[in-house]
Amino acid sequence: MGRLFGTDGVRGLANSDLTADLALRLAVAAASVLTAGTSDARPTAVIGRDPRASGEMLQAAVTAGLSSAGVDVLDVGILPTPAVAYLTAKLEASLGVMISASHNPMPDNGIKIFAAGGHKLDDAVEVAIEDALDGTAPPVLPTGAGIGRVRAVDDAAQLYLAHLASAASEPLAGLTVVVDCANGAASALAPVAYAAAGARVIAISADPDGLNINDGCGSTHLENLQKAVVDHGADLGLAHDGDADRCLAVDETGAVVDGDAIMAVLAIAMNEAGELVENTLVATVMSNLGLHIAMREAGINIVTAAVGDRYVLEELRAGGYSLGGEQSGHVVLPAFGTTGDGILTGLRLLGRMARTRKSASVLAATMTTLPQVLINVKVGDKAAVAASPSVLAAVADAERVLGDGGRVLLRPSGTEQLVRVMVEATELPLAQKLADELAEIVGSV
């Protein structure tokens, strides 16, 4: 078997790439690795899911695998990914499992695994789980009383809502927010959390039926949210994805406020409050140059991580920093959680609006987004592209043209035979021209 884990767990077409059999065997392997050497007489695992139809099947399979390996399973039901991570720590479980494919279409699904404390797995642990899965010797499984038991955690949602309430920075009375729940895991919780903080809430795409998750809604389809914000005269729109670990925003004019702009607003707020450790924000290589410029002007440093919130988390933990995230809307506040939390991000952004009495458009204007062109180029050999003299020369030429007013990034896809060519410049035509030229050279290698 090739590499199973991607940048955010195991993901694929449910019942084809990701079968019940694979889910069960993966659960047994994960249990063997994550409970090895534990002092717990009886290991426990928290398990939750988003509402997509295949989640019931995969949760049953994972639950069977865990309990067959002697792990007691705590079923928290349909909850966001950050809630599962939080409850893994809160309930002192040995591991946590979230069944979700995040922003992917309904036919896909995925399995995200958390270690004790609610932390995402590092590469070495993922490799160990894959090795256990590939092992030729059958696992030694308990019998009788050694088999794990399964119980529902009836107050799981209330525990997570209480956590969100404790992390809210300001009362939100007087603010109106439209929240797009993507017909996903946030549907029953996000409107409650924002209302509990004092906001007037208008919820859309908050009626999951197992089939409509991410269907023309949520953080990857902002059009309905933009219209709703303008139609209702709302102060802000917030969009979550299927498992609510990300948040994008729409200001009162209907303009999109992406993850970079949200991070800029929160970084400045935390810096003013003395909460931004070492005046440092962790972003990824895909964050817009405009974020770097805005942070430099605000006296804030940026540490750059690889793409993927797990790599942002690694940098946050290594440096002890207090804020990080991605352009896609994954924002991590380590003081309140171990992974991106879309609802928490929305609460903090609304809190900044309430505290400053400034509109979302004014706050977002802290950062000017430079025009960005991204082209996906199909290639035969990603390594050959990275080492190609013609590609290296073309990148150097483009960087000379841009100077300090832009940047070039070539990034191989982690899952496909693609190289992503990204160019930012002060003017869109220049970015497009350079990106087209680079894409042609990359494609010819």
From Swiss-Prot:
Catalyzes the conversion of glucosamine-6-phosphate to glucosamine-1-phosphate. Belongs to the phosphohexose mutase family. It is an enzyme of class 5 (isomerase). One of its GO terms (molecular function) is magnesium ion binding. It comes from the Bacteria. The keyword Isomerase applies. Its cofactor is Mg(2+). Its EC number is 5.4.2.10. It catalyses: alpha-D-glucosamine 1-phosphate = D-glucosamine 6-phosphate. Keywords: Isomerase, Magnesium, Metal-binding, Phosphoprotein. Activated by phosphorylation. SUPFAM superfamilies: Phosphoglucomutase, C-terminal domain (SSF55957), Phosphoglucomutase, first 3 domains (SSF53738). GO terms for biological process: carbohydrate metabolic process; peptidoglycan biosynthetic process; UDP-N-acetylglucosamine biosynthetic process. Binds 1 Mg(2+) ion per subunit. This is Phosphoglucosamine mutase.
